[in-house]
């Protein structure tokens, strides 16, 4: 019997997951196309996003999915507030630097969460378009107050992007209770799947407005 992987991800996979990988699929086969559509629909249902959101699967890591979200769904003239309390907030900062996006940062220690009043102060004193937040910071396991952040961002009429890698599928994230424009996650953490598939759940109108943003 294989030992259990006590890591954030990849996780130990179930026998049913392993058995599902025994089959070969042609990318243009009807069964594969239907399976892909079914998976996308199921992921959208996890955020109660039917008819409002689309799932964009990415053949790559969770970081690749986050980078795709940042690069394709923001504009060159966007101004972003990045909330940082660990390595993955820092990673979004690095992405914005490489992409040439204008941003400010609010960083606290890895064992602390961000103060909502301070976030509001930063929003009110800067001409922002987006706020980037990590739901569960993988490096420490700390949970950020995503519902409070989302309510504040919605009230300021800004766009919220969430890195939910270590939360998606395990912690509440419903579009019926909080407002967000895009969330990135992956197959190999709380969903207990195999590595290699990241995905972004994005509002229909946001993906329509992103036409022409992609670098490839």
Predicted ranges, named:
Residues 114-169, 182:
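Active-site phosphate-binding strand-loop segment of PLP-dependent enzymes
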Residues 5-7, 56-59, 105-106, 132-133, ...:
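General beta-strand structural signal in soluble alpha/beta enzymes
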Residues 2-59, 63:
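A glycine-/small-polar-enriched, mobile loop at the entrance of the PLP active site in fold-type I
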Residues 91-102, 120:
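Active-site-proximal loop->helix
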Residues 176-188:
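Conserved active-site segment immediately N-terminal to the catalytic lysine
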Residues 12, 188-216:
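Active-site C-terminal subdomain of aminotransferase-like
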Residues 53-81, 85, 89-93:
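Conserved beta-loop-alpha segment that forms the PLP phosphate-binding cup at the N-terminus of a helix
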């Amino acid at each position: 019997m294989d030992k259990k992987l006590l890591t954030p991800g990849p996780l130990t996979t179930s026998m049913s997951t392993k058995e599902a990988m025994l089959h070969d699929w042609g990318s243009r086969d009807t069964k594969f196309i239907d399976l892909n559509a079914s998976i996308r629909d199921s992921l959208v249902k996890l955020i109660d996003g039917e008819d409002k959101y689309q799932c964009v699967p990415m053949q790559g890591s969770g970081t690749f999915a986050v980078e795709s979200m940042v690069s394709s769904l923001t504009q060159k003239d966007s101004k972003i507030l990045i909330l940082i309390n660990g390595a993955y907030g820092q990673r979004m900062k690095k992405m914005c630097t490489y992409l040439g996006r204008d941003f400010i940062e609010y960083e606290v220690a890895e064992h602390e969460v961000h103060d909502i009043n301070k976030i509001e102060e930063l929003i009110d004193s800067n001409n922002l378009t987006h706020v980037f937040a990590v739901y569960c910071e993988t490096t420490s396991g700390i949970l950020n107050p995503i519902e409070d952040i989302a309510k504040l961002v919605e009230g300021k009429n800004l766009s919220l992007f969430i890195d939910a890698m270590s939360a998606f599928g395990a912690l509440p994230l419903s579009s019926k209770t909080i407002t967000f424009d895009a969330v990135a996650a992956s197959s190999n953490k709380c969903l207990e799947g195999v590595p290699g598939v990241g995905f972004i759940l994005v509002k229909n109108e946001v993906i329509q407005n992103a036409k022409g943003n992609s670098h490839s």
